[in-house]
């Protein structure tokens, strides 16, 4: 007797099965077979599983399970990232919520880091717990945290090697600076937001009594103004930064300013003289064609300053207030160079000192002001001087920190950098030579653009949590780099009497993440490398990740892995789109549209969902709006769908597009799919009680041959879709086979054989039912592991299969069944399906009760179809509840009947006693209209010369055949309509 539950309830078996898999060690690498390695992009330890994680992890798990079933030695390397900034923010917020008065600063570095480790121990396994619920089949014993001793040793080794190779240096450059966090941040952590602002035009007086003839023209080239001016007009969106200007620039070929190339201007409010320089960067058509240059507070201006050797005047403190130069640079108030020296001839030390000296020219009333208060004062004083020419609205791209929401400041500070040019050149070669493949390939263009426009990488962060930079300074300011202080002292002969202090900065998290492909395999420790399979599992097979981190992570892994190991990190890079909500909006806490994958799996009440979406908002005022929208969208909360339904939904949505809209309605549909599979399995089990088969079926019926041929085709499609990372097509193909071919058709077509007195046909049909179902479960397993395992365990004893789990059962292969002689059976069953569909449509439209038997009349111009009808008479009668089947001669009068056409065959159901004649006339009129529409479509294509000339001949022939078929159907329908 079958022990399968009567209804599909994923909560009754999913967690149980995962615990069994893990306990049995099914996910541990086998050390046999060809290696197949997948790298999990390590999620932040601060976070929880969101839809983006679930999306990518489902696809990764499907790949791993698929290859494991094909005999590969699979390693799915998982772990978490220490997430420096995010973790510090979370722990600081938790300290505030505890109400003990403890803060990051009051605890000090060591105390705060101890708190971070406490928090990490309590919450660090959240992601792994959620991944298990999703069904990820990874070897958790190899899970790695980027702050573990092994990867930490790899970070130190990488830093020291690159430093010794001259690739890492310490210097003063512009970085993205968050004035709230008081640290540099990466470009990925900056969001450029379009906002309304202003463009202010300011007169900059020319120095030394210089004047020029200013001429303006209209769009047609007509002169509209000519006057002598002793000033230039400069437009800016950040007037407060003019206090740090060290030049104004014009285009070298701008005729308006040719006489001013050696001039100077008097910088308003400071009285400093700064040069007029020429640079191709200037857009002559924008504004007046005169641009202020503030190298310390604008990334483009910084590049100009580097080209022209301009001094850099840093205006701001770390929290974006105007500096007090006497505190910041106490030794640089007096000039230190000959007053007559050309600024273009300054060396780097002189240039830096000059910038610090020029900061003393900042007027005293500005010192200590917040940047926006300084802006107000600058504008007020410019107005008082009557040199604020114009103020007009202007759209701005404002850089804001993605965590604090604050405007990010281009900030001049001492940081550690990696020289990127040589690394990037090599990284581009590895991709363009084909050693690394991008899927879809168009993302190579994005990769190429970034690599060809690369800048040196700022790797230091002003945080406490993270990998501390392995550099020590003595009291004289000399820097020494090494793996630890003892090595530094020994290497440089520094005795105990020389005080050393380690750099207080930490490395940004991308520095450790770039080492992920090989630090997780034990590098650089030779014993750990041997134990963890460095030589076997590097390069990994595929990286599945989003396009938003191609440069920040993918490119850096390529460059670092090549630099440190001489290998590529992975063979394929499968770039996924980004998950958005059903309206195409980005999912975010602030929008209140985030879906927790576990809520889709296990369900959640509306009250809990509202609480989850509104608690802890950065903008509490949004809570009411979010609650209202949530209650409208999910009035009853979210029902439990189970992990398999979510996974199949994700696969079905995984197109190669840039954006992927997640529709919860799709998950409901795929829950129904799992339910249908469950019910079909119950049918098979109930009809094969006591059966025991081995080997491949020897089919005796056309229906068996047809389904086995379809199985072979869907198997081929499955392998092709995995190879091309087309999970959407994979899901579609498997869905069509499972739902339509197997459940809707073969199960129905099997019923006549199962109820037939031909015991051999019944036995072979039972064998084929079990065989195809078992194969289907294996095909589906990588996408829907739980339901397939639960069903498979019930099916396989009847097939003599003793493998403990479907996870390790061989994946179906093309040719498992020899279907080479099944073409006729395939055609016959497709004909039978057409017959059944046509008659069922007639019965439905006539509202004939399912249990009522009807008479079927058949009519054709030839006798060709009579043998086939005879062969399938029992199936037709069984499936269509036919009282009898009779033939009419061609041209013979027919009684009033409901008609359908299948090929050359007219199907007639006499209406006497069945239906209202008026209703049948309406039905025929409707069917005639439908067929006319199909004929119109065919004629439209065949009447299009471009289609006929350019489409493959087989496609054109198919269209002509369709036209002939529809035309035949129309004639038959019109004939029947005429009789009514």
Curated annotation (Swiss-Prot):
Q: Would I find Repeat among this entry's keywords?
A: no
Record Pfam families: Anticodon_1, tRNA-synt_1, Val_tRNA-synt_C
Under Enzyme Commission nomenclature, its number is 6.1.1.9
Coiled coil ranges (UniProt) are 914-980
PROSITE patterns assigned to the protein according to its UniProt record, in alphabetical order:
AA_TRNA_LIGASE_I
**Is this entry keyworded Nucleus?**
no
Q: Which InterPro entries match?
A: aa-tRNA-synth_I_CS, aa-tRNA-synth_Ia, Anticodon_Ia_Val, M/V/L/I-tRNA-synth_anticd-bd, Rossmann-like_a/b/a_fold, tRNA-bd_arm, tRNAsynth_Ia_anticodon-bd, Val-tRNA_synth_C_sf
The EC category is: ligase
Show the catalytic activity.
Answer: tRNA(Val) + L-valine + ATP = L-valyl-tRNA(Val) + AMP + diphosphate
Its main localization is cytoplasm
Its localization reads: Cytoplasm
* Annotated keywords: Aminoacyl-tRNA synthetase, ATP-binding, Coiled coil, Cytoplasm, Ligase, Nucleotide-binding, Protein biosynthesis
The source's domain of life comes to Bacteria
Which HAMAP family does the UniProt entry name for this protein?
Answer: Val_tRNA_synth_type1
Describe its assembly.
Monomer.
- Function text: Catalyzes the attachment of valine to tRNA(Val). As ValRS can inadvertently accommodate and process structurally similar amino acids such as threonine, to avoid such errors, it has a 'posttransfer' editing activity that hydrolyzes mischarged Thr-tRNA(Val) in a tRNA-dependent manner.
For this protein, the record's PANTHER family field holds: VALINE--TRNA LIGASE, CHLOROPLASTIC_MITOCHONDRIAL 2, VALYL-TRNA SYNTHETASES
Q: What is this protein called?
A: Valine--tRNA ligase
């Amino acid at each position: 007797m079958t022990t399968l539950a009567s209804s599909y309830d994923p909560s009754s078996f999913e967690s149980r099965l995962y615990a069994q898999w893990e306990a049995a060690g099914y996910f541990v690498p086998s050390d046999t077979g060809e290696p197949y390695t997948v790298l999990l992009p390590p999620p932040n330890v601060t976070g929880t599983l969101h839809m983006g994680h679930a999306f990518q992890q489902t696809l990764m798990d499907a790949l791993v399970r698929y290859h494991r079933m094909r005999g590969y030695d699979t390693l799915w390397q998982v772990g978490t990232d220490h997430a420096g900034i995010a973790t510090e923010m979370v722990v600081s917020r938790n300290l505030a919520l505890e109400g003990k008065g403890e803060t990051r600063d009051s605890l000090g570095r060591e105390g705060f880091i101890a708190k971070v480790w406490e928090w990490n121990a309590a919450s660090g396994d959240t992601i792994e717990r959620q991944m298990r619920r999703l069904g990820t089949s990874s070897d958790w014993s190899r899970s790695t945290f980027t702050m573990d001793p092994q990867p930490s040793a790899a970070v130190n080794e990488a830093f020291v090697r690159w430093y010794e190779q001259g690739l890492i240096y310490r210097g003063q450059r512009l970085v993205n600076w968050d004035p709230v966090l008081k640290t540099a941040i990466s470009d990925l952590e900056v969001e450029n937001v379009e906002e309304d602002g202003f463009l202010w035009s300011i007169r900059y007086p020319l120095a030394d009594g210089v004047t020029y003839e200013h001429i303006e023209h209209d769009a047609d080239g007509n002169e509209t103004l000519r006057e002598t001016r002793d000033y230039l007009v400069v437009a800016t969106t950040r007037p407060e930064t003019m206090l740090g200007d060290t030049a104004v620039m014009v285009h070298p070929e701008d005729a308006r300013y040719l006489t001013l190339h050696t001039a100077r201007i008097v910088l308003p409010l400071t009285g400093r003289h700064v040069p007029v320089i020429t640079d191709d960067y200037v857009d002559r058509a924008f504004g007046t064609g005169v641009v202020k240059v503030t190298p310390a507070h604008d990334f483009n201006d910084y590049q100009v300053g580097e080209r022209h050797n301009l001094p850099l005047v840093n205006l701001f403190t770390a929290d974006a207030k105007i500096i007090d130069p006497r505190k910041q640079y106490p030794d640089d108030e007096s000039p230190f160079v000959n007053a007559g020296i050309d600024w273009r001839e300054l060396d780097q030390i002189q240039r830096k000192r000059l910038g610090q000296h020029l900061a003393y020219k900042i007027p005293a009333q500005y010192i200590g002001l917040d940047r926006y208060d300084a802006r107000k004062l600058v504008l007020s004083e410019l107005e008082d001087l009557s040199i604020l020419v114009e103020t007009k609205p202007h759209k701005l791209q404002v850089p804001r920190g993605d965590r604090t929401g604050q405007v990010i400041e281009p900030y001049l500070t001492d940081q550690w950098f990696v020289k990127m040019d040589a690394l990037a050149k090599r990284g581009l070669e590895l991709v363009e030579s084909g050693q690394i493949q991008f899927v879809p390939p168009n993302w190579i263009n994005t990769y190429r653009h970034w690599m060809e426009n690369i800048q040196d990488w700022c790797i230091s962060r002003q945080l406490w949590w993270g990998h501390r930079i392995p550099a020590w300074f003595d009291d004289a300011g000399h820097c020494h780099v090494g793996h630890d202080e003892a090595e530094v002292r020994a290497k440089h002969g520094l005795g105990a009497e020389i005080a050393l202090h380690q750099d207080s900065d930490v490395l940004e998290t991308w520095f450790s993440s770039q080492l992920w492909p090989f630090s997780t395999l034990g590098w650089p420790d030779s014993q750990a490398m041997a134990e963890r399979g460095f030589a076997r599992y590097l390069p990994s097979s595929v990286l599945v990740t989003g396009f938003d981190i191609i440069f920040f992570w993918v490119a850096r892994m390529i460059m670092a892995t090549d630099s440190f190991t001489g290998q590529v990190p992975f063979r394929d890079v499968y770039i996924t789109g980004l998950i958005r909500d059903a309206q195409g909006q980005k999912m975010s806490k602030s929008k209140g549209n985030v879906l927790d994958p576990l809520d889709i799996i296990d369900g959640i009440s509306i009250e809990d969902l509202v609480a989850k979406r509104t608690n802890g908002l950065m903008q509490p005022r949004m809570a009411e709006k979010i609650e209202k929208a949530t209650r409208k969208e999910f009035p009853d909360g979210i029902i439990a769908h189970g992990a398999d339904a979510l996974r199949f939904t994700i696969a079905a949505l995984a197109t190669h597009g840039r954006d992927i809209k997640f529709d919860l309605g799709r998950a409901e549909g795929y829950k129904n799919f799992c339910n249908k599979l469950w019910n079909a399995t119950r049918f098979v089990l109930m009809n094969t009680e006591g059966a025991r088969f081995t080997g491949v079926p020897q089919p005796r019926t056309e229906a068996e041959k047809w389904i086995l041929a379809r199985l072979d085709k869907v198997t081929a499609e499955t392998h092709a879709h995995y190879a091309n990372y087309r999970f959407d097509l994979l899901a579609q193909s498997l869905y069509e086979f499972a739902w339509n071919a197997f459940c809707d058709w073969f199960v129905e077509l099997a019923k006549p054989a199962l109820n037939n007195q031909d015991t051999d046909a019944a036995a072979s049909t039972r064998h084929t039912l079990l065989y195809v179902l078992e194969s289907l479960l294996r095909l589906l397993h990588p996408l829907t592991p739980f339901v397939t395992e639960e069903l498979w365990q019930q099916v396989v004893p009847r097939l003599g299969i003793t493998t403990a789990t479907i996870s390790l059962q061989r994946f179906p292969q093309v040719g498992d069944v020899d279907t080479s002689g099944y073409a006729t059976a395939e055609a016959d069953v497709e004909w039978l399906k057409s017959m059944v569909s046509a008659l069922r449509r007639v019965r439905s439209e006539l509202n004939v009760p399912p249990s009522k038997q009807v008479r079927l009349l058949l009519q054709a111009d030839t006798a060709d179809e009579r043998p086939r009808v005879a062969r399938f008479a029992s199936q037709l009668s069984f499936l269509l509840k036919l009282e009898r089947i009779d033939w009419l001669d061609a041209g013979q009068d027919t009684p009033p009947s409901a008609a359908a056409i299948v090929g050359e065959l007219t199907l007639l159901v006499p209406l006497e006693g069945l239906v209202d004649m008026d209703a049948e006339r309406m039905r025929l009129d409707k069917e005639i209209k439908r067929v006319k529409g199909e004929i119109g479509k065919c004629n439209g294509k065949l009447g299009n010369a471009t289609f006929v000339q350019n489409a493959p001949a087989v496609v054109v022939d198919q269209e002509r055949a369709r036209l002939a078929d529809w035309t035949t159907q129309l004639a038959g329908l019109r004939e029947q309509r005429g009789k009514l």
